[in-house]
A protein has these predicted regions:
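Structural signature of outer-membrane beta-barrel domains
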Residues: 132-140, 299-301
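Long, internal scaffold/assembly segments composed of regular secondary structure
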Residues: 120, 125-129, 171-179
Length: 379
């Protein structure tokens, strides 16, 4: 039996509750939906017979809207082509979901303006404008959640690989900005725990996609490393034809070494009184080859100070004094600096890895494992 008509929902309400006492339900209120020409018998060659419009309020704060065309009764899944808009989505309201993945979002507002196309043949999401402002986001690692973190990381990596390899799925950010935000990594599996973070962070993204096929994707980040050291992070991602092709550069200067003290206490049981840290790196990946370097720099670092440490146990005083002596052997006497340049040139470890897998490995191995090389030498 064929039918045709108008379908609507007025002032609807939807609640998602995980049933956990520590998490609040997610609510979508004031749901208004109107579907015109709602039919099970579209005309021939009519992919989207219906006009659809939806507006809603998320957690009493964020406006969400969708307007376009659809075939809601298509088999095996509905077909939708529509503009979408999200205004002032408060990240703290996503905590029940983000918390599952050890992510804490305490502040921040997200605006999205884009277009989506969904069918059994393909999924295409084009975000024309993305703006995230005043966000504070931390990934929290702890001994208790380590097994779960490993499982989540494996699932996320596998899903990312599937999405990248699937030619029917495309997610693209045409233009995105992150303003006045802070992102960090909190390690609660050490004693003491510590936090590595970038504050006052601004990020700009152009033409970035899960499938690098057209044009060059650009990412620019500025901020303050550990709240004190000005940093710049620039990347250019060219189309994969057929292998990853991109450049990365990182510059961190004038970071107060005292900012590292909790990290140093966690791994080396030592303190610093003053000094500066800097880090420089340029990397290029093309034709399954990596070319580049990392260069950390320590300047005017003092590890041991008798006045500062007079109340510490004698054994620890001696240990830190020896560490300071080793650093003295490494320093340039005229400028009192300790530095080394590590060449990273060579073949890509996994020749089948995609761009985002290689970037992840480089950030982890070339940056985070090299961020404290001067301190590694003095331990």
């Amino acid at each position: 039996m064929a039918f045709r008509g108008t379908f609507s929902v007025n002032n609807g309400h939807l609640t998602y509750d995980e049933g956990k006492t520590a998490s609040e339900p997610l609510r979508i209120d004031r749901i208004d939906v109107e579907v015109q020409n709602f039919t099970n018998r579209p005309e021939e060659n009519q992919e989207y017979p219906s006009q659809i419009r939806m507006n809603a309020l998320f957690q009493d704060q964020s406006q969400m809207g969708l307007e376009g065309r659809a075939n809601l009764l298509a088999i095996p899944v509905p077909r939708v082509e529509a503009d979408l808009k999200v205004d002032r989505l408060q990240l703290k309201n996503l905590l029940p979901i983000a918390g599952r993945y050890n992510v804490q979002c305490t502040t921040g507002a997200l605006d999205i303006n884009g277009r989506m196309r969904y069918s059994k043949e393909s999924t295409d999401i084009a975000i024309k404008e993305l703006r995230l402002q005043d966000a504070k986001i931390d990934y929290v690692h702890s001994a208790a959640t380590k097994p779960k973190e490993a499982q989540h990381a494996k699932k996320v990596a596998q899903k990312a690989k599937e999405v990248h390899q699937d030619p029917t799925v495309r997610v693209k950010v045409e233009h995105g900005k992150v303003l006045n935000s802070e992102v960090g990594f909190v390690n609660k599996a050490t004693d003491p725990d510590y936090r590595v973070f970038i504050s006052d962070m601004d990020m700009e993204v152009e033409n970035l996609s899960n499938r690098l096929e057209e044009g060059t994707g650009i990412v620019k980040i500025t901020g303050k490393f550990l709240g004190s050291g000005p940093m710049e992070w620039n990347a250019a991602f060219r189309p994969e034809k057929p292998r990853p092709d991109f450049d990365l550069s990182v510059k961190i200067v004038r970071t107060k070494v005292e900012s590292f003290n909790n990290i140093l206490r966690a791994y080396g049981e030592l303190d610093t009184q003053h000094g500066m840290f800097a880090f420089f790196s340029e990397l290029k990946v093309k034709d399954n080859q990596i070319r580049g370097y990392v260069k950390p720099l320590l300047k005017d670092v003092e590890v041991y100070d008798p006045e500062q440490d007079k109340d510490k146990p004698l054994a620890k005083q001696i240990y830190e004094a020896v560490v300071g002596g080793v650093l003295g052997l490494l320093e340039n006497k005229s400028r009192k600096e300790a530095a080394t340049v590590t060449d990273l040139s060579g073949p890509v470890e996994n020749p089948h890895a995609n761009t985002w897998q290689i970037v992840g490995n480089l950030v982890q191995n070339a940056f985070f494992k090299a961020i404290l090389p001067g301190f590694e030498r003095v331990r």
